[in-house]
Amino acid sequence: LIDPFGGRDDLAAHLVRAVGEPERRFEEDALRILRLYRFAARFGFAIDPATGAAARALGPHLDCVSAERIQEELLKLLAAPRPGSYLEPAVLAVVLPELEPEEQPERFAELCRTIDRIEPTAENVPARLAALLWPLGEAGARKALRKLKCSNALTDEVTALEREAGGGAGSFLLGHESGHSIARPIACGNRVPPQ
């Protein structure tokens, strides 16, 4: 096996690293920025510091990527075991600027913890997306989902969860410490979980 870029060593170290110059890789296709976080989340790997720095610096290049491609990577990221740890504020600020992840870091950190509390199954990706968009409320979530070109079915499911949870910026600021209690019923299929 010929391994000119040290991939086997990175696998052994549980590290995701761009091949060659990360800036160049991300300039070739900015969607690789989201893929970096998706693969790291999927396998629970760390991100090489230089690769992570390049991803954050070149995050604005995601504006040139189609909404459909961004949506696909975001949904795959949300299907990972603990995606909250890999939702990079500088990147998400480009993909979903209305969340203001860099302006409100405490709120964003609580959102990430809430997302991680929802069981990681394909069926729960809409619940995780609803948790991510919760500060926007139902109307804001619908607008964000349309911008990402999500299907009508996914948009309806996520906004129904938003409506049931009573999402919105004001309610989040008043009760952000209760995010885990909201995630528990969502993780149980919106049934009242056993006490």
Regions found by a protein language model. Give the residues of each.
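Double-stranded RNA-binding/processing signature
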Residues: 59-63
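C-terminal subdomains that position terminal phosphate/3'-OH groups for nucleotidyl transfer/ligation
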Residues: 101-195
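Short, well-structured alpha-helical segments
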Residues: 52, 56, 87, 155-163
